[in-house]
């Protein structure tokens, strides 16, 4: 049990109870099985990177695999190898955060994530055919890095304004050169938002299938209120209401009045019973 999961009077949260049940169920398959590796994904489309769960490092989505299978945005070869290790009871190095927690006798995020309804509902499907492509229920996406701010806790990778500044003036003198232009090479270098992006194209090809399974969908950036893809999502949701969808937008809320009013108009429409929750 983790600190804070149970109060002094013995009350146990449903979150904890579900995690404990998930642990018992996961252990019937293997001591390293984690449903998040199948049912959750964060997609960084400007760089063609993804991960399932926030703890493992991002890995590349081979662009050539998307032509005939847009779900390869999530079901990458690398991720399938990690899933295979989990089914064999082996502990992937990238998940060391959870292994450390569990070695101390605590529940880890592996148990908490696997205990959430969006993940646990497909336990039997995954166990029956773990190497098959699967549609995630919890998706976070950033479509491009266009942003009007350059917040110090962010990165030029996620802010076109900051990227433009370091190109003109050079990097801030930090001990680790994480905002230096030379740091953003290869997969760290975002595709400019003004250019065609094969990862975004693949996302929209996959979207109708993905949407059917979605329960949690979060759009980040860049600044999503500046991005046409955000409003394309809104239009689709309004045309295809989904009563179990939790829709989330992470915004700096510092856009022009025109964009702010446009966003508010969509929020009013979305909050009239089209989805379960908007934030």
Tell where the protein language model's regions lie, with residue ranges.
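Accessory C-terminal segments flanking Radical SAM cores
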Residues: 11-117
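A short acidic (Asp/Glu
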Residues: 38, 53-56, 109, 151-155, ...
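Well-ordered, non-membrane alpha-helical segments in soluble/globular domains
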Residues: 77-80, 197-204, 230-233, 259-265
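Detector for the c-type heme attachment site
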Residues: 99-101, 154-160
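Core AdoMet radical
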Residues: 136-146, 157-198, 211-228, 240-261, ...
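Leucine-rich repeat
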Residues: 204-210, 234-240, 265-271
């Amino acid at each position: 049990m983790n600190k804070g999961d149970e109060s002094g009077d013995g009350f146990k949260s449903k979150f904890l109870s579900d995690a404990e049940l998930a642990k018992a169920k996961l252990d019937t398959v293997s001591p390293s099985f984690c449903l998040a590796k199948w049912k959750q994904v964060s997609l960084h489309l400007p760089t063609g990177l993804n991960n399932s769960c926030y703890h493992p490092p991002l890995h590349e989505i081979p662009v050539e695999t998307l032509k005939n299978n847009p779900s390869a945005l999530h079901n990458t070869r690398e991720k399938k190898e990690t899933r295979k290790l989990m089914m064999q009871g082996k502990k992937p190095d990238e998940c060391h955060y959870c292994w450390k927690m569990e070695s101390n006798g605590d529940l880890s995020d592996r148990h908490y994530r696997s205990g959430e309804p969006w993940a646990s509902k497909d336990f039997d499907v995954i166990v029956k055919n773990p190497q098959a492509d699967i549609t995630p229920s919890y998706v976070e996406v950033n479509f491009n890095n266009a942003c009007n701010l350059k917040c110090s806790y962010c990165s030029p990778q996620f802010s076109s304004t900051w990227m433009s500044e370091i190109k003109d003036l050079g990097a801030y003198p930090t001990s680790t050169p994480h905002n230096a232009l030379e740091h953003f090479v290869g997969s760290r270098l975002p595709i400019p938002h003004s250019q065609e992006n094969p990862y975004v194209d693949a996302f929209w090809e996959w979207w109708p299938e993905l949407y059917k399974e979605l329960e949690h969908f979060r759009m980040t950036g860049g600044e999503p209120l500046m991005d046409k893809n955000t409003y394309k999502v809104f239009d689709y949701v309004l045309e295809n209401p989904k009563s179990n969808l939790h829709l989330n937008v992470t915004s700096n809320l510092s856009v022009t009045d025109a964009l702010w009013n446009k966003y508010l108009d969509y929020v009013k429409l979305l909050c009239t019973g089209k989805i379960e929750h908007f934030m």
